[in-house]
Amino acid sequence: MSSSSPLQRQIMRICQLHAWYGDLLAQSEIQPHACEISELPLMTSALLEKHYYAQQARQEAGLSVFKTSGTSTGVRKAIYYSEEDDEKYIAAKAESFREWLAATDSAGPNCRPAVIKKALADMGTGHAASTALTIFKQLGWQAESLSFELPIEQHIAKLEAFRPELLYTMPSILDAIVSASGEPHLLGIQKIILVGEIAPPEWQSNIAARFGIEPQDILDTYGSIEIGAIAAYSHELGQYVIDSGIHAEALPAELIDERFEPLQANEAVLVLTSYVRTLFPAIRYVTYDVVRDFRTVTINGKERQCFSCIAKRIGTDLKHGEKISLYDIESVVHQFVHDAELRVKLIQNKLSVHIRSKSLKDEMLVHIQHAIEHKIGDIGLMIQNRILEGISVTRAAENEQLERGAVKSKKIYF
């Protein structure tokens, strides 16, 4: 390995900013100047708990600090961004959005050029939300934001009053907007950027139709508070393309933790090394997200890593629910109804899929149940092995309030 390789430079920088990481390498007799990435320790949740999250509060000038949601452990943890981290994130996102808009404007006869003058950020808390207005202003747009905690009627009122051409939001918020507005195509939204939750292609196509736009007018992005921007969905490739400043690995689950059961042949746990992040030790960071069809492709003469979807997330508590892919369930349901908003529960080994949809007919419920059981291999196998007692698919009343998470609502409820 060259002494000036990006990996070696990043290792040395992380050792300078996180002294414990250098100690960790020394204990394992790993030479930062002469090691392969596969020799470096996996940055697991246990390692971060011991060293990063337990550290004294950092005091450097210009710091931004964000707290995790704490949904998995009940404890909110501090994650730091330096001014450099923020600047690189904002520049990368602005360029990504600019390239996407240019590409969709010239994608074909069905894609009319969009003139973006106003953009609205309507999402949860965290790094993506805090930087959205800065990114929009760099792109020359009039920008405003809205708290996700407000009643949905206020979201609709804001959209009607501000009339943004571009909406930056979360899929569950978009579901609620579509359900409450009745005629979302009248809101004048021409482009949608998504963050924070799963958005299967079937769902994206149905949402695009409701707004009177094309699927290519939706950009689904994948990121995390630890890493920042990770990937964005390419409708042309049908793949999530990983950011050029990141090196990704797709590892077997049992290599991460011997308690994890093997995944399906085309699935692996995503592990990331960022060459731009500094105040988080993003070297072989284990996301615990399970991706499918990980591969390397050539785009515009450059090799890029990509995957087809995030199927699910695994963790050390080993719930049966970790074998269940919300992505797959959403994909199946949206093959039957175009306006479905759903909540999935796993209670006492019974899987419940509760659907709110104006187009859903009662006779469809049994067909959706059959499709979930027979098209999603893991669920069918769990029922066959009596790990799951069965599936119930029910419809929600039109005015029924669906469960909402503290930030994310697209998840499996236990």
Show the residue positions of the predicted features:
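Generic low-polarity alpha-helical segments
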Residues: 7-10, 14, 113-114, 118-119, ...
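Short, charge-rich amphipathic segments
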Residues: 20-30, 53-67, 81-89, 131-148, ...
